[in-house]
Regions:
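Short, linear, compositionally biased motifs with a strong N-terminal bias
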Residues: 10-11
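Sec-dependent signal peptide recognition
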Residues: 2-7
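Alpha-helical substrate-recognition element adjacent to the catalytic core
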Residues: 20-166, 174, 180, 277
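C-terminal cap/substrate-recognition subdomain and adjoining C-terminal extension
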Residues: 19-27, 33, 37, 51, ...
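C-terminal motif of bacterial Sec signal peptides marking the signal peptidase cleavage site
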Residues: 14-15
Length: 277
């Protein structure tokens, strides 16, 4: 026993001397950008293997008009019941807009800039997987190439995501380089995807126009001990003037008129609160 004591003591000293791995030791930074040309130099700031995560709405793509835009979605939350611009079953109407509307790149050179980046890439959106068709169409029409699947995965995957063990399950989908998370915490959803794919990146760079998404990703990666750079993309103007509000109200009334004439049962379902999304 006495012979073992010096060995045990030496091991104890070595353990105390070794630096502890703490989540708060991970590098974490956030900055504003208004040009996607700034993504490439940000990726090159370290020699670490880096995963580039890109939001879609108002980051890669934006709506040509106010109705159906990301800003319109936020405006909907402020409208009182009975306002002629407030839509019933908001996410059903959003899905209709995705299927029928058009979007453009947030900046003319955006697709070329993003397509040229050699890093592992992931498009991470809050959109529902049921809106996948319209999402892929608008990305293609704008000139964006879909990223290669991470880890060389041959097929996509869909699963019930829970942000906490007792949380309600929400269906998410990762396929063709696009991760659709149905409004879930993007940081927690990304970690769940990487865990399921048995992948690890020492550094993640997120480009997103939403401050909440930037902050959620920062919190999740810090807790996981992963270095993080959040690039808050501010190019798209979020202000709403009276002309926008008028367009928002007129847009929904135009939809109502079309649905009433062509698909009255769907309009009745929407206005009765029978939401599919």
């Amino acid at each position: 026993m006495r012979r073992l004591l010096p060995v045990a003591f030496a091991l104890l000293l070595a353990a105390c001397a070794a630096p502890a791995v703490r989540p708060d030791a991970a590098a974490s930074d956030v900055r504003d950008i208004d040009d996607l040309a700034l993504v490439a130099p940000a990726l090159a700031e370290t020699g670490q293997r880096t995963l580039l995560v890109l939001d879609i709405d108002d980051t890669l793509l934006t709506s040509a008009g106010f109705f159906g835009s990301d800003t319109w979605y936020e405006w909907q939350k402020t409208l009182p019941a009975g306002d002629p611009g407030k839509v019933p079953c908001l996410f059903d109407v959003i899905s209709l807009n995705y299927e029928t509307g058009t979007q453009r790149a947030t900046q003319p050179d955006g697709p070329a800039l993003i397509n040229a980046l050699p890093n592992d890439k992931l498009l991470l959106t809050s959109r529902n997987p049921l809106s996948r068709g319209g999402t892929l169409r608008t990305l293609h029409d704008a000139g964006y190439a879909l990223p290669t699947m991470l880890g060389g995965q041959a097929e996509g995957r869909s699963w019930d995501f829970r942000k906490a063990p007792d949380a309600k399950p929400v269906r998410v989908l990762y396929d063709q380089g696009v991760f659709m998370t149905t409004g879930q915490d993007k940081g927690l959803a990304l970690l769940d995807l990487l865990r399921r794919a048995n992948l690890h990146y020492p550094r993640v760079v997120l480009v997103d126009d939403g401050q909440k998404n930037i902050d959620n990703m920062r919190a999740a990666l810090r807790a996981a001990g992963i270095d993080y750079l959040g690039l808050h993309y501010t190019r798209v103007d979020k202000t709403i003037d009276q002309a926008d509000a008028d367009a928002g109200r007129a847009g929904w009334q135009a939809w109502r008129q079309l649905l009433a004439g062509a698909y009255p049962q769907r309009l009745q379902a929407l206005e009765s609160g029978h939401c599919a999304y």
